[in-house]
Amino acid sequence: MVWLRPNLANTPQGRGWLAALEAGSAAALFDVDGVLIDVTGSYRRSVAEATTTLTRIMLGAEADALLTDAPSPLVMHDEIILFKLAGGFNNDWDLTQALTALWVARVREWRGQPQAQITLAEWAAQARIAAHDGHGGVRWLYEVASASAIPSSDDARWVHEEYYWGAELARHHFGHTPRFVPDAPGFVHAECALLDASVLPGLAAQGVSRFGLITGRDGPEIPSALNILAP
């Protein structure tokens, strides 16, 4: 089994791996998240909960009053997918930062202004255009939201990681003491395999002898995925 992250594709090492896959036999390459592993209750839920928590932290004492009519969590699964499809937000930490900023700006910086009426789906459409034009992702975020509404990338990262890994695994993998959700159990435990057990043998019977995974997962996320796919 060969791992190839997208940013390695044009490196000597990446080209070597691809050559190994292609040498003399058919190969099947799979994406991981959403294809081989169901991440609806892990990565996606972590983004939603992290956005909600970080938005409340950013708003401080005004949070309850400003979010009176807001949904809980502040972001729905379909809205997360729209931003993923837009481009520029494959990194969940960047997406958490962006969604938090849009919510903070909506209820505080843009309060009473036309921007406050723009839905997340509409923002995702704008993000898609920006990505197509070469200035998507976090760069686009700083173009549309004021700096006062944007949380630090470090805070966005760790609140997401604490929800995803949980307190115990955050300490184990990163030596990180949780400060946002210290009692989080970890949504990573909700991940499960999507691929039917008969698929790989079926492909092998058709002549596919090499299988690979193409993924943006990194660090401890990789063995975590392997444990699900090959327990």
Role assignments for model-derived ranges:
Residues H77-L85:
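A contiguous, well-ordered beta/alpha segment that forms the leading edge of an enzyme domain
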Residues W3-H77, D94-Q97:
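Active-site neighborhood of HAD-like aspartate-dependent phosphohydrolases
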Residues E62, L85-T100, A105, R111-I118, ...:
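Cytosolic catalytic headpiece
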Residues M1-F30, E62, P73, I81, ...:
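Non-catalytic pre-domain segments flanking phosphatase-related domains
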Residues T52-R56, A101, N227-A230:
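A general structural signal for alpha-helical elements within enzymatic catalytic domains
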Residues V39-Y43, G88, D92, F187-C192, ...:
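Phosphate/oxyanion-binding active-site loops and adjacent basic polyanion-contact surfaces
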Residues G16-L18, G24, L29, R139, ...:
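Short, acidic loop-to-helix structural element flanking the phosphoryl-transfer center
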